[in-house]
Each structure stands twice: as structure tokens, then as C-alpha cells.
UniProtKB/Swiss-Prot annotation:
Coarse class of the protein's main subcellular location: cytoplasm
Role according to the record: Part of the phosphoribosylformylglycinamidine synthase complex involved in the purines biosynthetic pathway. Catalyzes the ATP-dependent conversion of formylglycinamide ribonucleotide (FGAR) and glutamine to yield formylglycinamidine ribonucleotide (FGAM) and glutamate. The FGAM synthase complex is composed of three subunits. PurQ produces an ammonia molecule by converting glutamine to glutamate. PurL transfers the ammonia molecule to FGAR to form FGAM in an ATP-dependent manner.
Protein name: Phosphoribosylformylglycinamidine synthase subunit PurL
HAMAP family: PurL_2
Annotated positions binding ATP: 56, 95, 501, 538
Subunit annotation: Monomer. Part of the FGAM synthase complex composed of 1 PurL, 1 PurQ and 2 PurS subunits.
GO terms under cellular component: cytoplasm
Organism: Latilactobacillus sakei subsp. sakei (strain 23K) (Lactobacillus sakei subsp. sakei)
Annotated binding of Mg(2+) 2, by residue: 121, 274
Gene name in the database record: purL
Active-site feature positions: 53, 99
Length: 741
């Protein structure tokens, strides 16, 4: 057996620094909290529990700015996932998580275990997972390493979700140079639950038992939480030991067993929590902390797949497919028998105590004896310095970017080929989107839609964020991220209910990065107040840098909305010849951060144009009202690529064309002014629609049988066949993925 360093040796060699603790944090532990030197195992426990990934020590002051309450909120931040009331005794459960650093090192396993972890968060609440979504960011596809990352991440997401039998129904993929060495892999899971079955991760009741269930513990993922709380450098790209390895078939058994316990034997169960980041220590210490209790654990009882594991390794392992249960005394044998019936390990490893102390025994020795609060509530909270990035002053001094569009048709086709805009079906065809046969609107739409069996209702769900906008203006960009998510939900016929988030940023110790974080959070909060969408769960991923270069601020917004009647489900495709086409919202010369600017200049700059939350809300309310009154046959939000791209996307499914006339310069077809929709209305409903639109909708054309897109601008008439546009859009990514860099 390896002799671990003594407490004095840890202090003298500053080993704690390698595990992510600072000198001041170590001093706080020694002099204020324990009033002694922590031993090897205890130092390891502090290092992961006080990491940013677990403690949110840098982000807590920012997260407090989010609205978390609302009429539908049943569970806000603080548990495995958030929960919203959707009526009839039912609730929707959802959360998003990041797995950025692991996916950069081992993209398949990093992405797969990210999906597995977020699924466990959902069923730990007692909910049946019904959908997975993802939000992915990569560098440019002219790089072979990026192509490899894309292939492996997509395969990892699909491989895990498909095997476990949960449909991957939607998401988004964007490409920008800032993500070249630091990809973002954010996964979101949505579940359904009867409100009476809601569970919490609390270890209540002295004498109740702590059970370990699921897969055995190995050495994979040790210090994964610490790994996720540091930035990349050249030498750190090989930290594969910090990446977990997943088994979706084991997860399926674990999910089924947990749901059987919750739904059929809830009287046996006190609390349940996933062993995610920081593994066994995080799950058990948090369960005790939330209940105001203590815990004694016997680590010799923990099922292990490797020999001679130390207490440190057992506690910090992030082996996948494991859960911690608090079981009512006297029911241990029944619970163990239930899990063994699924061929899963199930072992009593400890018990709940009244004394709020966290004690670990291993091989007959007390290897850790800490106050529970020391690991959870006592973590320091930092109020970081802030400074406005210098680039913003440079952008403000520049003349506004106005694109030169000399060949409108060529520009239109070129935009359709841009990786962020182009057809993503070559990626999402790896996902089974229809397993369980509840998916009504498939990937590639504004929002995915999943029906709720036994009711007339459905859920709309989406993930959204444009990091370019946040790079130019974090506050307004944060507002736009929420606004676009809500716009997508509304376009599908849903009422936005709430959000989860993955807040992806660079190193918070840099004042400019922390300023971006704070400003964007304020923007998100303001938008959430406007749309009535509280933040009910989420995740913070900081230190997304490589060799000192940060990603764009990228706060991914995952939103869920309720479609009150499946008859309200609306899709983006034009459906019937002679339907009238309306543009809702004004179009200005907004090109800052646009796909056109990136395509023409190779970079982004300038100040974002004016954005009004009030206008956004009014336009969304109009569209939703029209949908619910049965006046709209299709709806599509305008985002990357502007009006020309949105109109094109509306033609691709049915192959219908259109005649459109707009009082715009040709270049404005590609402007990315916010708060806009295109909708189609039957001619018979024209008067009714225009009556409720109050002049905020402009009639710009009609749908035609001829598969040609005709657009008359103030400058010219542009014609483009649907076939040519669709071919360009569909072929772009497969060609890029096959080409040699």
C-alpha cells in the first residue's frame, strides 16, 4: 500500500495547491475551521468540495441576481434539478450541465458521461426522463482536430442517449475560433413527474441508513471537479485520468430501479442523490448538509472494481452510474433486494447521525472527521474585481459596420453554407429522436416538442445562446439569449415557463472576464423578469481558456414552455399555396456579430444595435395569441442570417416557393435585428389576424406552388430556386467534415 503524505508534509510541500486549494484557503481550513492540519484524505475532500465546480465560490454573488421564484416553481436551484407545475398534478423537471473540459480531452466519453450525469439528476428527483437536448460549440471546421472533436462528441451524445432509450430531440451547434481548443458541451435533460412523487436529496432522521447503489467505484474521474475548475494549458490537455467512463446500459438499469423504488415504495426512501461531480463525498455531504444532520460512512463497504483503493480515491472517484440513498431504518433489506434484482450493487455504507459531523472509516481507522458545514457552507465566497474589457472601447470608437453586398444571390447561398447556419442533420441523425414515440416536432426546428401522454398538452423545449453578441455587449447579449429561447418556444406554440442555464466563461480571476459574467447575468435576469421565466436550475463552467485565451462569454439558456393544446403546435415550414406571409418586427441595419460580418470580415466587431425587451415581449405575445386563436399556419423566428435565411428554411420541408416584397435594401435581408418572426396566415384569416396585430405585422408576400424564392427589395429582384438553396444548405457540413484541412 502506498504511504500517503502526512498532514505536515502536505503543508510543507504545498501539495494542496496541486489539488486547487489556494494558500489562503488552506490557511482558513487549518486555523479557523479545523484548528489543526487536515490529513491527506481530508485535504482531498476540501479540494473538491471547495472547487468552483462544487462550491460556486466565485459565482454565488452573481447567481443571486437571478429571479428564482414564480407561480409555477415547485423546486428552484439547490436540488438535483428544478421543477415547474404544468397543471393536473403534473410537473416538468429539467436541468442543464456542462462537460467542457472532459470533452476537450476525451470527447466521446466526456460527452457521453455529460449526458449520463444530467439524466441521473432528473430521475433522482423522481421524474421519468423524456428528452435530451444539447448545446455545442467548436472551433472552425478547417481544422482536423475540430472535426475529430465534433465526430466524437456527437457520437458520445448519441451513443449514450440511444442506448438508454431517451430521445435526443433538439439543440444547437455553433462554430467560432475561440472554441478551437476549448469546446463547449452542454447537455440538458427534461423529465415528467407526478407532483406527489417529487424527491429531495436530503439525509434526514438519525439512525436511517446510507446506501450506495449502482456501478462499482474505480479510479476514473478522480479530481474531475478540480479539473473542471481550472483552465487549459498545453501540458493539461493529457489529463485523461480526470475523465469518467460511462455505461449507458448500467444507467438504464439504475434508472429503472430508482424509479421503481420512488414510484412503488416511496415509504422506504428518505432521500436520493446522484454521485456526480466530486463523487461520493459531494452526494453524501450535501445530503447531510441540506438536512442539518451528520453522517458516518464505512468505506470498506463501498463496492470497488479496483484493488487497494485508498479512502482518498474512493471518496473522490467520479465513476459513473452511482447513486446515494437515504433509506428509512428497517427497510434496508427490501431496497437492497430491489436493486440486486436489476443486477446492481446495493450496499449499506453508513448511517445518519444527529451530530453534524462527517466521519469516514477505512480499514479500521477514522480517516476523516469534519464538520459537515466545513465541506459545504464554509467554502469561501469571492467578490472578484471587475473591469470593462478594453475591446469594447475600441468597438465604440469604430464606425458602424455596413456590409457591401454586390451579388445578393451569391451572398445568400454563401450564408446558407456557413457551418453555424447550414443543415445539422448529418450530426443529429446519429440521435434517436423518436424513441418512446412522443416526439412531435423533431430536431432542426425552432423548438422540439414532446407530447404529454394522456393529456392534450405538450412541452416545447430549446437551447439558445449567441456568444458573438455577448462578446460585443455582455448585458444586451444576455438579454438576447433569453429572448431568442423564448422566441423559439413561442414559435412552436408554447408559453415560456422557466429556464435552466450553463454559464460558460473564461478565468474569473481576470477582471474583464468577471465583468462579462456579471453584466451578462444582469441581462439574463432582466429578460427572465420580462418573460416570466425564472431560473430554476443550472450550472457554472468557468476557466474555459486555453493558454490564456478565453472563449466568448456563452451563457447557454435552456428553456421549457407549455403548449396548452396539441392543436396549437406550430412549425416553421410553409404549408399551403397562397398563404399570406407576414414579417413581425422592424428590420434595421444590425450586422454587429452577424453571420454576414463573420463571413465577410473573418471576425466580429462593432456595437450591438438597439434591443428592447418590451418590443420583444409584445411581438412574442402577438404570435402566441394568433397561434392560440388558430390564425397562424407556420411561425419561424429570425436569428442567424436574418430574413433571407429564415425564409429559405421555411421552404425546405415542403418545397414551396414564395413571392415577397420588402421595403428594405438588399443587404438588410441578412441583418440580424432581434424580435422578429415570419408567420403565414390563410387568406380567410387575414382580417382577423390584422385586427389583433395592430400594424406590428407587415404583409410581405404569399406562398407559391412554384419552388422559386422571389424577393423584391428596394434595390433589385432576387430569384433563387428552393432546390439550389436547399442543396447548398444540406451539402455544406458533410463537405466540410470530409475535406482535408
Amino acid at each position: 500500500m502506498v504511504n500517503n503524505p502526512t498532514a505536515i508534509e502536505i503543508q510543507q510541500t504545498k501539495l494542496y495547491q496541486q489539488w486547487g486549494l489556494t494558500d489562503s484557503e488552506y490557511e482558513l481550513i487549518c486555523t479557523k475551521i479545523l484548528k489543526r492540519l487536515p490529513n491527506y484524505t481530508e485535504t482531498g475532500l476540501f479540494s473538491v468540495m471547495w472547487s468552483e465546480h462544487c462550491s460556486y465560490k466565485n459565482s454565488k454573488p452573481i447567481l443571486k441576481k437571478f429571479p428564482t421564484n414564480g407561480p409555477h416553481v415547485l423546486q428552484g436551484p439547490g436540488e438535483g434539478a428544478g421543477i415547474l407545475d404544468i397543471g393536473d398534478g403534473q410537473a416538468v423537471v429539467f436541468k442543464a450541465e456542462s462537460h467542457n473540459h472532459p470533452s476537450a480531452v476525451e470527447p466521446y466519453e466526456g460527452a457521453a458521461t455529460g449526458v449520463g450525469g444530467i439524466i441521473r439528476d432528473i430521475f433522482s428527483m423522481g421524474a421519468t426522463p423524456i428528452a435530451i437536448l444539447d448545446s455545442l460549440r467548436f472551433g472552425e471546421l478547417n481544422d482536423n482536430q475540430t472535426k475529430y472533436l465534433v465526430q466524437e462528441v456527437v457520437a458520445g451524445i448519441g451513443g449514450y442517449g440511444n442506448c438508454i432509450g431517451i430521445p435526443t430531440v433538439g439543440g444547437e451547434i455553433s462554430f467560432d475560433p475561440c472554441y478551437q481548443a476549448n469546446p463547449l458541451v452542454n447537455a440538458m435533460c427534461v423529465g415528467l413527474i407526478e407532483q406527489k412523487d417529487i424527491q429531495q436529496g436530503k439525509a434526514r432522521g438519525a439512525g436511517n441508513s446510507v446506501l450506495y447503489v449502482g456501478a462499482k467505484t474505480g479510479r476514473d474521474g478522480i479530481h474531475g471537479a478540480t479539473f473542471a475548475s481550472d483552465e487549459f494549458a498545453e501540458g493539461k490537455a493529457t489529463q485523461r485520468s480526470a475523465v469518467q467512463v460511462g455505461d449507458p446500459f448500467m444507467e438504464k438499469l439504475l434508472m429503472d430501479a430508482c424509479l421503481e423504488l420512488i414510484l412503488q415504495h416511496s415509504d422506504w426512501l428518505v432521500g436520493i442523490q446522484d454521485m456526480g461531480a466530486a463523487g461520493l463525498v459531494s452526494s453524501t455531504a450535501e445530503m447531510a448538509a441540506k438536512a442539518g444532520t451528520g453522517m458516518i460512512l464505512d468505506l470498506d463497504q463501498v463496492p470497488q472494481r479496483e484493488t487497494d483503493m485508498s479512502a482518498y480515491e474512493i471518496m473522490l472517484s467520479e465513476s459513473q452510474e452511482r447513486m446515494a440513498l437515504c433509506v428509512r431504518a428497517g427497510y434496508e433489506d427490501q431496497v437492497i433486494a430491489l436493486f440486486k434484482g436489476y443486477d446492481l450493487d446495493a450496499v449499506r455504507i453508513g448511517e445518519v447521525t444527529t451530530k453534524e459531523q462527517y466521519q469516514l472509516w477505512h480499514q479500521g481507522q477514522l480517516v476523516a472527521d469534519l464538520p459537515v458545514a466545513a465541506l459545504t457552507d464554509a467554502a469561501p465566497v469571492y467578490h472578484k474585481d471587475q473591469a470593462k474589457p478594453e475591446r469594447l472601447a475600441t468597438f465604440a470608437a469604430q464606425a458602424p459596420y455596413v456590409p457591401s453586398v454586390t451579388d445578393t444571390q451569391a451572398t445568400w447561398l454563401a450564408l446558407l453554407k456557413q457551418p453555424t447556419i447550414a443543415d445539422k442533420s448529418s450530426f443529429y441523425r446519429h440521435y434517436d429522436a423518436q424513441v418512446k414515440t412522443n416526439t412531435v416536432v423533431l430536431p432542426g426546428s425552432d423548438a422540439a416538442v414532446v407530447r404529454i401522454r394522456g393529456t392534450k398538452k405538450a412541452l416545447a423545449m430549446t437551447t439558445d445562446c449567441n456568444g458573438r453578441y455577448l462578446y460585443l455587449d455582455p448585458h444586451v447579449g444576455g438579454q438576447i439569449a433569453v429572448a431568442e429561447a423564448a422566441r423559439n418556444i413561442v414559435a412552436a406554440g408554447g408559453q415560456p415557463l422557466g429556464i435552466t442555464d450553463c454559464l460558460n466563461y473564461g478565468n474569473p480571476e481576470k477582471p474583464a472576464v468577471f465583468w462579462e459574467f456579471d453584466q451578462s447575468a444582469q441581462g439574463i435576469a432582466a429578460a427572465c423578469e420580462t418573460f416570466g421565466t425564472p431560473v430554476i436550475s443550472g450550472n457554472v463552467s468557468l476557466y474555459n481558456e486555453f493558454n490564456g485565451e478565453a472563449i466568448y462569454p456563452t451563457p447557454m439558456i435552456g428553456m421549457v414552455g407549455l403548449i396548452r393544446d396539441i392543436q396549437d403546435i406550430t412549425t416553421q415550414d410553409f404549408k399551403q399555396v397562397d398563404d399570406l406571409i407576414y414579417l413581425i418586427g422592424e428590420t434595421d441595419d444590425n450586422y454587429a456579430g452577424s453571420e454576414l460580418q463573420k463571413m465577410q470580415q473573418g471576425t466580429i466587431s462593432d456595437q450591438l444595435g438597439h434591443f428592447s425587451l418590451a418590443t420583444e415581449k409584445a411581438n412574442q405575445d402577438l404570435v402566441l395569441k394568433a397561434i392560440q386563436q388558430g390564425l397562424i399556419t407556420s411561425a419561424h423566428d429570425l436569428s442567424e442570417g436574418g430574413l433571407a435565411v429564415a425564409l429559405s428554411e421555411a421552404t425546405f420541408k415542403q418545397g414551396l416557393g414564395y413571392h415577397v416584397q420588402v421595403d428594405l435594401a438588399s443587404r438588410q435581408l441578412f441583418a440580424e435585428t432581434q424580435s422578429r418572426f415570419i408567420v403565414t396566415v390563410k387568406a380567410a384569416n387575414q382580417a382577423a389576424f390584422e385586427q389583433i396585430s395592430d400594424q406590428s405585422a407587415q404583409l410581405i408576400g404569399r406562398v407559391t406552388a412554384e419552388p422559386i424564392m422571389h424577393i423584391q427589395t428596394k434595390d433589385e429582384m432576387i430569384d433563387l430556386t428552393v432546390e439550389a438553396a436547399k442543396d447548398a444548405w444540406e451539402a455544406a457540413l458533410p463537405c466540410l467534415m470530409k475535406s482535408e484541412a
